[in-house]
Amino acid sequence: MVVGVFDKFSCELNNSKPHVLLVNPSDMGNMGTIIRSILGFGIKDLSIISPCADIFNPKTIRASMGAIFKIRFKIYNSFEEYSAEHGNHNMFPFMLDGHKTLSINDCPKTDLYTLIYGNEASGLPASYQEVGQSIFIPQTKDVDSLNLPISVGIGCFMFTSTNPIK
């Protein structure tokens, strides 16, 4: 058996780098997978709106495969609280009724952005249509939505490919 022991820690986000923002994520395994995925694409700043899954839960830590120790994260009480600190970012909420369809040939070009994703079960509230430019990931009619970690991975791939992190 292998056991890891560490102290819980807190971080401040880098305001001059891209962020991923999760709004009320509830699944600890998904959160760990997302942490690992964003780091894989070079995004090292994760913001989370509470209530949310426990970032220090063993399931989250295991799913992150150690990536949690290489990112910065901060938990906020509301989107307004996040926006007050990072309002200089271009905001891109990912929604099933997003106004812009994400495509390889037409991904928004910007160096400073926040990719916003909603809860696994309910997505983002309609009010996020008014936040920045809402994005839709195209998919077939055979499914009603994509899994949250898959959506985050697609968004991170597209944005970091179009806007390499410096």
Language-model segment annotations:
Residues 1, 17, 112:
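Conserved catalytic motifs of the protein kinase core domain
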Residues 4, 39-41, 55-69, 126-166:
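Structured adenosyl-cofactor binding patch, chiefly the S-adenosyl-L-methionine
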Residues 82-85, 102-104, 144-150:
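Short, charged, surface-exposed secondary-structure boundary motifs
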Residues 3-5, 20-21, 47, 115, ...:
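Conserved beta-strand segments that form the floor/walls of ligand-binding pockets within enzyme
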Residues 6, 10-98:
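RNA substrate-binding interface of SAM-dependent RNA methyltransferases
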Residues 25-28, 62, 114, 119, ...:
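Short glycine- and Lys/Arg-enriched binding-loop motifs that mark or flank ligand-binding interfaces
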Residues 86-91, 107-110, 150, 154:
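Short, surface-exposed amphipathic charged segments that create phosphate/polyanion-binding patches used
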Residues 94-144:
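Active-site/ligand-binding-proximal alpha/beta "capping" segment
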